[in-house]
Amino acid sequence: MEKLLSLYQEHIKTLQNRTRDALSRHHLDNVLIHSGEPIGVFLDDSDYPFKVNAHFKAWVPVTDVPHCWLLVDGVNKPKFWFYSPVDYWHSVEALPSSYWTHEIELIHLKNVDDIQKELAPFINKNTAYIGPNTQRADSLGVSLDNVNNQSLLNYYHYYRAYKTGYELACMREAQKMAVNGHIAAREAFQAELSEFDINMAYLMATGHRDTDVPYGNIVALNEHAAVLHYTKLDHQSPDEYRSFLIDAGAEYNGYAADITRTYSAKENHEFTALVKDMNDAQQALIATMKAGVRYSEYHIQMHQRIAGLLHKYGIVKGISEEEMVSEGLTTPFLPHGLGHALGLQVHDAGGFMQDDKGTHLAAPAMYPFLRCTRIVEPGMVLTIEPGFYFIDSLLAPWREGKYRSHFDWHLIEHFKPFGGIRIEDNIIIHDNKIENMTRDLHLA
């Protein structure tokens, strides 16, 4: 805890420095950051699970309390209004007392609407608001031009790519939780449990509820692995176990882990060998990574490796690996991007930004679903998650195209019952090395 305290103190200094610079550039006095408000279910008296504003949890590790407020100006100690009402209907969070509370000015907010008079001395025409409720900002007297001002958001989003020591420490803790879940899920798969029960084993091991994980767990058996974001969770076990893909994370102090593994249930099958080769290809790509290279270059290099596997297994024949890539023959097998920035959000902000003004560099036309085009730099946390799938809807156009004779359609049918493969690690870019948080915890 003592180490986390010193890291948090430096983290707050970094956020204060960024805020001071942002306010100066945008001619603002302060920024009001709203944790958010519950969203009610239509024609019902219940709410959807609360998800906190990412800009809020960047400052304080409070992720499950609505109606909280931060006022920051880059100079004075951040003011934190913590909502803790008297309520016998619902559980109420007590005022926090932890290593981080000494770095902010903690103020008890007993009633939601009391924030009006609490903030009155601080709100002026040069106050910005970052949060989900425009009407609430208006009621507090914030100028509409300063509500989620895009230029201000661009500034914050750009620098969010560079993680502080505190953020990296939190992300390493999230990795530990997620790895525990992945080990439990693998054992549940080996015990031939259903997707639903595998997911329960994962949640138990991480100490999370379904609403706590940073994204809906993808727990896919057999051909379900061909659905990139499969979240159905069958209660019934399949008649035959062929493959298992799990894409699941965890969260610590608001920071996410995002890990994927694929397993084969068949010892002597080409799919088992393909999983191993994909794992080797992913590790080989990471071994080449370094600061100063554009992320999209690594995405293209992964497609070259996919072409090599298509050639090795005879899935695509009679065409060079170079032409496979240039003509897009690898894209139905790897339809998504190599990965993305990771942090306060799973797909963290600023992946396309080339500067703090928000200059946008789109993904290459051939790879429209790539989520990051930035130069890889020290302090960044990225996912590396190549895939290799057998998806009918993506392969269908190639059955009729000019390259149709180069595909071994019989072999593709042979692989289809296994769905596909995705292998994902979370890495930190350092000056002279790549830290693989996932592999450092010995998750094979």
Curated annotation (Swiss-Prot):
Cofactor info, note text? Binds 2 manganese ions per subunit.
Q: What residues does Mn(2+) 1 bind to?
A: 258, 340, 385, 424
GO molecular function terms listed in the Swiss-Prot or TrEMBL record? aminopeptidase activity; metal ion binding; metalloexopeptidase activity; phosphoric triester hydrolase activity; proline dipeptidase activity
Ligand binding (Mn(2+) 2): 247, 258, 424
Q: Name one GO cellular component term.
A: cytosol
Q: Which keywords does this Swiss-Prot/TrEMBL entry list?
A: Dipeptidase, Hydrolase, Manganese, Metal-binding, Metalloprotease, Protease
The UniProt catalytic activity note for this protein reads: Xaa-L-Pro dipeptide + H2O = an L-alpha-amino acid + L-proline
Biological processes per GO annotation: proteolysis
Coiled-coil zones? none
Enumerate the cofactors the protein uses. Answer: Mn(2+)
Q: Does the keyword Cell membrane apply?
A: no
Question: So what EC number does this one have?
Answer: 3.4.13.9
Enzyme class label: hydrolase
Spell out the PROSITE patterns in the cross-references.
Answer: PROLINE_PEPTIDASE (PS00491)
Q: Could you tell me what this protein does?
A: Splits dipeptides with a prolyl residue in the C-terminal position.
Protein family: Belongs to the peptidase M24B family. Bacterial-type prolidase subfamily.
Q: What's the protein name?
A: Xaa-Pro dipeptidase
Species: Proteus mirabilis (strain HI4320)
